[in-house]
A protein has these predicted regions:
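Start-transfer (signal-anchor) and selected internal transmembrane alpha helices
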Residues: 1-43
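Transmembrane alpha-helices of multi-pass, membrane-embedded glycan-processing enzymes
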Residues: 10, 92, 96, 103-117, ...
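Transmembrane-helix motifs of polytopic, lipid-linked glycan transferases
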Residues: 17-22, 104-126
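Membrane-interfacial segments
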Residues: 22-27, 51, 55-56, 95, ...
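Extracytoplasmic catalytic/substrate-binding loops of multi-pass membrane glycan-assembly enzymes
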Residues: 51-65, 74-87, 96-97
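Membrane-embedded catalytic interface detector for glycan/lipid assembly enzymes
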Residues: 143, 149-151
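Short acidic/glycine- and proline-prone juxtamembrane loop motifs at membrane-interface regions
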Residues: 153-156
């Protein structure tokens, strides 16, 4: 568990470097908003992790399968759900990540999907739409809880969302 907290801090710092680069390229980029979104997403990581303690979750299988004896990394390469095992294999077997650390890593992938979604929509819809007399619609949409829940865990949601938003 301690490794997961350390990884959260490391990924937060890496995010700051990414934000510096993005802020140079995009005048509209808001580091403050992205930092708030980071911690909001981490809250959903905690919620999803709590959910997995008391309920069945695919994330447990995605953590267990890459540790099978007699399987190597490229045995998991493919276009099915085994691709998630392929992505997680080096972190579990070479870097020694535990379940909680894998949850954090994939939650960060999901978070990066939100960063790229923000860039995509802010670039392509430059008009700020205000709702409820006070709130920017894009900001409000970024904080909808459903996508945060499903992209804050070891699973398909985070890498799919990241990939979609990176190449949108």
């Amino acid at each position: 568990m301690l490794g997961a907290f350390f990884l959260i801090l490391v990924l937060f710092l890496i995010s700051q470097g990414l934000f510096s680069s993005l802020a140079k390229k995009h005048a509209f980029f808001s580091r403050k908003l992205m930092n708030q979104l980071f911690w909001y997403h981490i809250v959903f990581l905690g919620i999803y992790y709590s959910y997995t303690i008391f309920n069945r979750s695919d994330s447990k299988a995605y953590f267990d399968r890459p540790q099978r004896q007699g399987w190597n990394w490229f045995d998991f390469f493919g276009t099915s759900t085994t691709f998630i095992d392929f992505l997680s294999y080096p972190f579990i077997n070479f870097l020694g990540f535990n379940y909680e650390m894998m949850m954090v890593l994939f939650a960060w992938m999901g978070y990066l999907g939100f960063v790229y979604a923000y860039l995509f929509f802010r670039e392509n819809i430059p008009v700020k739409i205000t709702v409820f007399k006070n709130f920017d619609l894009l900001t409000l949409i970024l904080f909808f809880p459903n996508m945060h829940f499903w992209t804050a865990s070891l699973g398909k949601g985070a890498p799919i969302f990241l990939g979609l938003m990176m190449f949108a």
